[in-house]
């Protein structure tokens, strides 16, 4: 049994110096916790959740300083993101869960599944968590410039919850940290250590912040991951790009969730 009967709930979950806005659909189905993109919100998952339907227990939340309600923090590190998963699960009384992460959330999901093999039913990683050395000095500078260029309009959108309440430097630092976590010597051993059913859903082409075939080169790194670990497979490669995959190819993500649950 992975979930006891619960009623739908929406509220704030305290963790460290902050609190996270969370929604739990309740029910007795398999718990699925959804891990957002780096600066995205829980609303991105609505189509996947609709595809799966009410037979699952869907748990979504907004990370620190994301969305309209999650509070700011002194710590926006990757390890803080891992702690937040545990805080959400503890607050909702969930022991075992299936993790589904997109982009940055895929990295969180991979790390959490690797560290918690007895608690992870499985993982679905959507166009993220691919070991590749894409960060160098030139890329780091490109990241900082990109967030500086975006800084002028960010305050205008923050009241809508569409952009995070991190400043340009904080966003760049978070993205650069992700580049370091992505390195083959860092992420490769994490992927090799996963012992639960794990499925990738991959996007195609380029999206915001990438050039040429950069993202396809990164995706190609998964061939080695799949060859080394029999628990990991590619469920689908879809036509949509990284930014639109949850909107245009949500059905493929839902299918991967069912695939993992059926293993």
Predicted regions and their residues:
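A catalytic-pocket lid/entrance helix-loop region that shapes and gates access to the active site
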Residues: 129-130, 134-158
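Short beta-strand/loop motif that positions the catalytic acidic residue
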Residues: 194, 200-202
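Conserved loop-alpha-helix segment in the C-terminal half of the alpha/beta-hydrolase fold
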Residues: 207-240, 247-249, 254
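Active-site loop/oxyanion-hole signature of alpha/beta-hydrolase fold enzymes
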Residues: 46, 50, 59-100
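N-terminal cap/lid segment of alpha/beta-hydrolase-fold proteins
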Residues: 2-19
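Active-site nucleophile elbow and catalytic-triad environment of alpha/beta-hydrolase enzymes
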Residues: 173-190, 220
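Conserved hydrolase catalytic core segment
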Residues: 95-134
